[in-house]
């Protein structure tokens, strides 16, 4: 692998949107399953092309408030979860403020901190889990903490006990806890826990649960009313309202039967088992994902492997260094079982040198 080839592995953006009949992409974390059928009934009669309320469509805010047990006024609809996190940072941070991230992290987190003049600092996960002793030391002096569970890229679910400890620490220290729970409905083992409190902001999305990534509908909620007002003020000048059409489709998605989520979860579980067992059989060192749809195996020479798999075998994987860890790669199993099996076979061929 030449220096020029090494330099071509610039980041996930080089792979996002690539497709082809012979390409197997374990890259993007975008569900390939369909959204709820009822969301499409919005389209034929949609006529609302004017600006909408900055904070969101009232009926969508009310539906989400009912689900999360907060007042509607404490919900803000955003352009995906990414905007929700960006708004949190732009509202909270002054130049030089430190934000604690768990490592490995979702690749966008450090850059979002830096764009908003903050300084990312880290606490290392142990096999995907928060080490409370290390966390306790690392959180001192921070303005905010960002925790993601179920995790991307780890697939790990933090325990209620751990998250309640994190919640208490942050509220006691008056450090804002931004809790990214976009995969909360994709849990195979363990239990989801949503932290709460004056210094907690919960972030969620319709992208993963309802397979609506391209519509860009996320939201945040918090018990802190003053913080919510400051968020809305920031959004007023940054992006105004989230797409009205997308919000109407999101509102319909909330009416989908519970079987929609449980059916999708079983599909994800089967795919998880397929790729996890397949990688184990190939000799990889990895833990079993408890949620989301990623595996994060340890590999030797990950840059060479990612490049060769792409150029020689037409298999896309993501470098672990994009997520803060240099000796691993990330594979998403957001693709059908046949493609997972074909991708595993190509990885086997790569490992055998054929």
Predicted regions and their residues:
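Active-site phosphate-binding strand-loop segment of PLP-dependent enzymes
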Residues: 126-191
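Conserved core segment of the aminotransferase class I/II
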Residues: 199-269, 349-351
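Conserved glycine-rich beta-strand-loop-beta hairpin in the small C-terminal domain of fold type I
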Residues: 251, 266-276, 286-298, 324-327
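PLP-dependent enzyme catalytic core of the Aspartate aminotransferase-like
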Residues: 308-317, 323-354
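N-terminal small-domain helix-loop-helix segment of the aminotransferase-like
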Residues: 2-87, 255-256, 353-354
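Short acidic capping loops at alpha-helix termini that bridge into adjacent secondary structure
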Residues: 71-75, 95-98, 198-199
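Helix C-cap/helix->beta junction micro-motif
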Residues: 116, 172-173, 282, 313
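PLP-dependent aminotransferase-like
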Residues: 91-148, 168
């Amino acid at each position: 692998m030449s220096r020029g080839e090494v330099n071509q592995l610039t980041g996930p953006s080089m792979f996002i949107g690539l497709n082809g009949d012979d390409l197997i992409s374990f890259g993007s974390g975008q569900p390939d399953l369909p959204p709820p059928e009822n969301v499409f009934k919005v389209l034929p009669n949609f006529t609302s092309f004017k600006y909408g309320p900055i904070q969101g469509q009232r009926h969508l805010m009310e539906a989400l408030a009912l689900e999360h047990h907060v007042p509607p006024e404490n919900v803000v609809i955003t352009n995906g979860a990414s905007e929700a996190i960006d708004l949190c940072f732009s509202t909270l941070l002054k130049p030089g403020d430190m934000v604690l991230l768990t490592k490995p992290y979702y690749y966008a987190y450090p850059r979002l901190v830096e764009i908003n003049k903050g300084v990312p600092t880290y606490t290392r996960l142990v096999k995907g889990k928060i080490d409370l002793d290390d966390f306790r030391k690392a959180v001192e002096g921070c303005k905010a903490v960002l925790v993601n569970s179920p995790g991307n890229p780890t697939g790990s679910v933090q325990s209620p006990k751990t998250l309640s400890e994190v919640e208490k620490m942050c509220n006691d220290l008056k450090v804002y806890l931004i809790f990214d729970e976009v995969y909360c409905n994709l849990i195979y083992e363990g239990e989801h826990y949503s932290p709460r409190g004056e210094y907690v902001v919960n972030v969620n999305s319709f992208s993963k649960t309802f397979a609506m990534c391209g519509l860009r509908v996320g939201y945040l909620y918090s018990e802190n009313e003053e913080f919510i007002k400051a968020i809305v003020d920031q959004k007023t000048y940054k992006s105004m309202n989230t797409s009205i059409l997308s919000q109407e489709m999101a509102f319909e998605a909330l009416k989908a039967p519970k079987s929609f989520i449980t059916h999708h979860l079983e599909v994800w579980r089967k795919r998880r088992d397929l790729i996890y067992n397949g990688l184990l059989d190939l000799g990889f060192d990895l833990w079993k994902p408890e949620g989301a749809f990623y595996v994060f195996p340890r590999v030797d020479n990950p840059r060479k492997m990612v490049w060769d798999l792409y150029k020689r075998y037409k298999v896309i994987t993501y470098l672990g260094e994009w997520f803060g860890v240099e000796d691993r790669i990330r594979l998403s199993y957001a693709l059908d079982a046949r493609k997972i099996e074909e991708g595993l076979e190509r990885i086997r061929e790569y490992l055998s040198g054929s």
